[in-house]
Amino acid sequence: MKALFLVLAAAMAAPLVLGAPKDEKTKSTRWKITGQLEEACSCNAACPCWFDSKPTRATCGGNQVLFIQKGNYGNVKLDGLAVANYAQSPENQTMMDSFGKWNFSTNYIDEKANPEQRKALEAIAAAVLPSNNGSKNFKTVYVPITRKIEGKDHVITIGNVATFTGHLVEGGLGGSSKITNPPGADPLHHQYAQGKTTRMIYNDSDQNWDWTDTNYMLGTFTLDSDQYAKFVAGLAQKMAKKEKTESAEKK
């Protein structure tokens, strides 16, 4: 976990000052987004990776898709846009401990976005997902990103390379089943409703996925740059405390 804290802190801090649109290149471009998270992966539900456990298959391959209802990056409006990331862990390793060594990480930016909005979405994705630091095998693609809600089913389509359909599962006491503050939680995943996919297909990044009845998660979010700055600071404090404890134990 030591390596994880160091990598995540560096990964999330950098986008707070880099990647700003031309007229927003300052040390503290502030941003805020509100919307919904659609997420699915190859693991059986619920995905154990959020508990720093190994995936239920040889690898965990999955996505995070942000549908922004309202947002801005500095003066750049992001209302109605979307951004997604697909990634996969190495075999027999957790997503958390293998961060930086993932088999691949691919960002998908809403093609509706203009050039300034694309740069803004890329910067936010790097902070929130954080996608471009997860793997040396990284690329960004501009595609249509859509969602249809058909009864209980949420159908998400990423260009012509990916689609998945998910639905929530009922909790034992009624209502939807929710997971709150798992060990791997970040501001985006402070709480999410648990579900399962009907089907998940992905044909890009040298992959050919076609799975059914796997992990699906649905969340709502209101995120901003101040929140992530505090999150990074918190990771740094945890790292310092951990190093101090380990140093004392060696004496």
Language-model regions: role of each:
Residues 1-5:
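Positively charged n-region of N-terminal signal peptides that target proteins for export
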Residues 7-15:
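Bacterial N-terminal signal peptides
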Residues 27-250:
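Beta-strand-enriched cores of mature, soluble protein domains
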Residues 17-30:
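Cleaved targeting-peptide boundary
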